[in-house]
Amino acid sequence: MNGTTGFGMAKLMEDAANGAFKTEKYTFDVKTDFAKEVLPALINGDADIAAIPTNGASIAYNKTQGKVKVLAVNTLGCLYVIGKTEIASFADLDGKTVYAPAQNPTFIFKYLCGQNNVNVTIDNQYSAPADLVAAVAAGKVDYAVLPEPMITVAKAKNADLKVSLDLTAEWNKLDGKQDTLVQGCVVVRTAFLEAHPEAVANFLSAYEASVNYVNTNTEEAADLIVKHGIFAQAPVAKKAIPKCNIHFVAGDDMKAAMNTYLTILSGINAGAIGGKVPDDAFYYLGK
C-alpha cells in the first residue's frame, strides 16, 4: 500500500527495476485502499505478498480462514497529536475534543485516553487523514491525531502548528507494552508460501535490507518513494521518514508484539480485527 506502510519497500522496488535479483522476478502494484483493492487481490490470488495495516492482516486471516499469514512487522506507531497549542501530557486534553481519522487512529487514541484516565471527546467528522490535515492546517480544529507523513504535510501548510504527543512514546510507557504498537506489516498468501518457501525467505532478506536502507539514506529513499508511487512529495517524505518508525520485526518478536496489539484492539472493537484474535497459525516464524 501507499504511505508509511509502503515506505520500507522503496529500495527493493528500485533494485528489482534494475534487475538486481537473479532468481526472483517482482511485480509491484501500489494501492491506496485496503478493503476495496488489497484484500480482494489477496483473496483472488492477484497478489502474493502485500504491505498492509496490521489489523488488516488479521481481517484477511479471519476472512479467508487462514489463507493469509503475516511475515513481518514493518511499521511501529506513527501517530501524533497536533494542534494550535502545545500540550505537555494527556492530562492537558481532559475535557477537550480531539479529532481523529476513523478506525485504528481512533481506537489507539481511545485506548491511551482510558489508560491515562482522561475524558476526551473523539470526533470522526474528518474520517480521512487528508481531510483532517486540511482542517488542522486551516485552524478549524484545536487538536487532532494524525499519522506521519500527514503530520509533516500539515506542518508544511501551517508552521504554527504544535506537535505535542508521540502516541508511540505514550504507548511504550504502559506496563508490558514496549514496542507493541505495531501499525503495519507484510503478509503472504499461505498457498504461495507453501509452494515457494525459498522465494519468500529471499524476499524477506531483501525486504529487511530495503528497510535498513530507507532508514539510513533518507534523502535517496525519499526520491525512490516518489519514483515508485508510494508517496507524492519527496521533501515531505525526507522529513517524515525518521518519525515514521519504519522497522523490520520478524519471528517470535513479531508474533508477541502483534498478538498484544491485536488483543487490545479486540477489546475496543472486535470488528476492527475481523472478529477475533488470530491463532498461532497466523504467524510465519521462519521455521
Describe the function of each predicted region.
Residues 66-73, 96-99, 173-182:
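A structural signal for short loop-to-beta-strand junctions that line the ligand-binding cleft
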Residues 259-287:
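Conserved C-terminal helix/tail region of periplasmic/extracytoplasmic solute-binding proteins
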Residues 1-17, 84, 88-153:
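Bilobed "Venus flytrap"/periplasmic-binding protein-like clamshell domains
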Residues 193-268:
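Secondary-structure end/capping motifs
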Residues 70-89, 181-194:
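Hydrophobic/proline-rich hinge and linker segments of small-molecule sensing/allosteric domains
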Residues 1-37, 43, 60-63, 110-114:
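Short, polar/charged alpha-helical segment
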Residues 55-56, 128-224:
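Pocket-lining segment of extracytoplasmic ligand-binding domains
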Residues 25-34, 49-52, 119-128:
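Short beta-strand-to-loop elements that line the ligand-binding cleft
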